[in-house]
Amino acid sequence: MTRIVVTAEIRPSEDEDKVKVAVANFFSFKSSKVEEGKYRLFVAESDTLSSLSKFHRVLREERILDAARKYLRRGIEGDRLTFMIHKQAAYVGKITFVDSENESPLGPITYTVFHRDLEAVVDWLAPRTSRGRPLWDNPMPED
């Protein structure tokens, strides 16, 4: 079973709609909500890998498959893949991976992907390359 949860803090100085745009630039969610707490938290969810198709496309457009593959593989832990991207870069349509929450001044966008075969998910999103070109294009794994 596939489940994808994407979260982003909405800081007091931020426009909620801009945070939603930053998330939606790379993630086609089926449902969303705003949770109240220390910071307001935008939570978007989906139950299909196709919701990451925009992310898949932009990794190729930006030619960052090698870096993305290394970063994504580091985020696999059991049946969960977790990674973060810079929220302000995402708002303008760019993918910039971050290692800690401090690297994105307004907080990162955090992706958590649950899937039975996360290696296949990484192979689909960011396949191995040679001289910057994908060695293959894997089909999207089944949900």
UniProtKB/Swiss-Prot annotation:
InterPro entries: PAB1135-like (IPR002739), Ribosomal_uL5_dom_sf (IPR022803). Pfam families: RNA_binding (PF01877). It comes from the Archaea. Belongs to the UPF0201 family. This is UPF0201 protein Msed_1787.
